Amino acid sequence: MNRKLFSVLIAAGMLTSYEAWSQARVQVIHNSADAAAAVVDVYINGGAQPAINDFAFRTATPFIDLPAGVDLTIGIAPGNSTGPQDIITALNTTVNLTDGETYVVVANGIVSPTGYNPAPAFALSVFAPGREAASVTGNTDILVLHGSTDAPTVQVAETAVLGGAVVVQPFSYGVFTPDYLEVPAVDLTLEIQLPDGTPVVAYDAPLATLGLENAALVAVASGFLNPAANSNGPAFGVWVALPSGGPLVQLPLATDPTARVQVIHNSADAAAAVVDVYINGGAEPAINDFAFRTATPFIDLPAGVDLTIGIAPGNSTGPQDIITALNTTVN
């Protein structure tokens, strides 16, 4: 148990003995992109010291123990607060946790009265039962929250492994997925789409590369699609909270997949002694003056798409000189 938090709860008169304490496990994630809430202090039941001190945007606590079966008033104060007298009362939230339950709590929304459009009020999004590890060995479990105040209703498809299958049905701001996605711990590509399937943006989710096998994660849509209408705040992205807490991990924008290819010229026909090789009718040869019994090094070519390989004489001036072509796909 966090010693500081234990002291705060004792001071608040909430505990008489540790052994008698009913408790729940809670992870708190700061996803309010309002500049006024960039760093906050979090108080519980007006304790003399913040339970979470200097809590920064796009960070998370680890899973911590909190009292269950009693009302907890969560107070938010500026990050430079000196005590519970600095709590902004309009942001107070009261929760009552269930003994033995595990929760994910995400702070979302706007604190400022102006400068943001739209401006849904600051609130806590609560999900239970949370997970601290994957439910199946070898998997990664992912809970997803739509936490971008100005983003529309979207869905999420996986395009690298599942062939574009929709893994998150259309959901709107402030809504969690109904449960964790249970997926193999492999590198995925998550494509955010409008509900009609129109792609918006895609992100790599390198679960294997990052060693996230057996982990349970929380992914949040975070920031603003239109920063200019939101006090030039942080731009939209997908960020992931680890069960150990700390700074959220930003998912990188997806890159077009490539394959490594070596090409060897072994056509002994004198007419093909030296050729130029064009790909998809490009203006310049991808392989220039390619001679019999030579080879390219391994090169990157687009993967998963149709490639038209055009062969032209070695003195070609452009794709109009292609004399034969073949279609292929590399993965």
Residue ranges and their predicted role:
Residues 17-19:
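N-terminal signal peptide c-region/cleavage motif recognized by signal peptidases
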Residues 8-10, 15:
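Domain-scale selection of a single, long terminal region
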Residues 21-331:
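Intrinsically disordered, low-complexity polar regions and short flexible loop motifs
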